[in-house]
Amino acid sequence: MLQRHSLKLGKFSIRTLATGAPLDASKLKITRNPNPSKPRPNEELVFGQTFTDHMLTIPWSAKEGWGTPHIKPYGNLSLDPSACVFHYAFELFEGLKAYRTPQNTITMFRPDKNMARMNKSAARICLPTFESEELIKLTGKLIEQDKHLVPQGNGYSLYIRPTMIGTSKGLGVGTPSEALLYVITSPVGPYYKTGFKAVRLEATDYATRAWPGGVGDKKLGANYAPCILPQLQAAKRGYQQNLWLFGPEKNITEVGTMNVFFVFLNKVTGKKELVTAPLDGTILEGVTRDSVLTLARDKLDPQEWDINERYYTITEVATRAKQGELLEAFGSGTAAVVSPIKEIGWNNEDIHVPLLPGEQCGALTKQVAQWIADIQYGRVNYGNWSKTVADLN
């Protein structure tokens, strides 16, 4: 059987050929952990440090296609030292969350967007694509096994990390003939335990996160390691993250590992503008980014707001700040949802970003965070953004 998937990747497209059996959730095998753990107190949950009792693994080979999905006790992987993931970075991942709702159910937030992006990442580095809905079903079954470990309370959730790695043996560089797709989950607490905490950024042009024709719009592990050193260098100068600039124009692209938004005031028209960089192949197609844009276009008054995806520069930000036209700025991502910004270091000066009096965020930042949280925790229904995967009743 030959499974064909045609995926658009930036300015070009790849038709992937996933030979053999398709991914099939009905073939799931479950081996339960004989030593189930008890939920940890919420105050002990640190991002990505606590894991649930089970994991999902699905092998793939070019000859056989997708193998039997297996939910089994969380544990180590056994790989050959020559596996291509170790030598040539055949690796990609996703990040999404599941939430307890007032109806005592557990829902995943927009999993279809994550699966679509994961398939794009896989196709770009010649790893196998898969049937998105089947992986969503399997992830739901994994969550159901450990539903007692999904934390309760505003700001608490279950972080889900689907990962795919090339496992082919040998040191030759080429298309992997074997791969492993696995999913692990981690109970997590609020990114900001005591409410918002605005961050200081260093505008960075000496290092480049992504470039045209590259893979900056894909969620590959290889995109992240090179960004740590510039972050450490910024930290020595008192900044928490890098504001990534690109090109001679110093276009603003992303912040740290997040998409970034700015709010400007047009003093001539009196309208406010929410702006973020366009998806030109250098920007990660963030699910939270898309959620912010969709909600802003749906809920903000178009007579008072313009919502734009356009190029803008650090010079524009600095100039408009001096003119009193910079109103607020924030990053967006799965971990924090929104992360308010208070200062940006550039040319040996700090650009000050306004915050609400006595608070650590701007007005729109606060509103966006509430909109998204209400949907994630089941207080508000919005489209098909929440998918129920377990019932606790």
UniProtKB/Swiss-Prot annotation:
Transit peptide start-stop: 1-16
Catalytic activity field: L-leucine + 2-oxoglutarate = 4-methyl-2-oxopentanoate + L-glutamate; L-isoleucine + 2-oxoglutarate = (S)-3-methyl-2-oxopentanoate + L-glutamate; L-valine + 2-oxoglutarate = 3-methyl-2-oxobutanoate + L-glutamate; a 2-oxocarboxylate + L-methionine = 4-methylsulfanyl-2-oxobutanoate + an L-alpha-amino acid
Keyword tags: Amino-acid biosynthesis, Aminotransferase, Branched-chain amino acid biosynthesis, Mitochondrion, Phosphoprotein, Pyridoxal phosphate, Transferase, Transit peptide
Gene deletion effect: Causes delay in G1 phase, slower growth and smaller cells. Lowers the levels of BCAAs and reduces TORC1 activity.
UniProt-recorded Gene Ontology molecular function terms: branched-chain-amino-acid transaminase activity; L-isoleucine-2-oxoglutarate transaminase activity; L-leucine-2-oxoglutarate transaminase activity; L-valine-2-oxoglutarate transaminase activity; methionine-oxo-acid transaminase activity
Biotech and industrial use: Isobutanol and other branched-chain higher alcohols (BCHAs) are promising advanced biofuels derived from the degradation of branched-chain amino acids (BCAAs). Degradation of BCAAs begins with transamination reactions, catalyzed by branched-chain amino acid transaminases (BCATs).
Enzyme class: transferase
Protein EC: 2.6.1.42
PANTHER family, A to Z: BRANCHED-CHAIN-AMINO-ACID AMINOTRANSFERASE, SUBGROUP IIII AMINOTRANSFERASE
Protein name: Branched-chain-amino-acid aminotransferase, mitochondrial
Species of origin: Saccharomyces cerevisiae (strain ATCC 204508 / S288c)
Encoding gene per record: BAT1
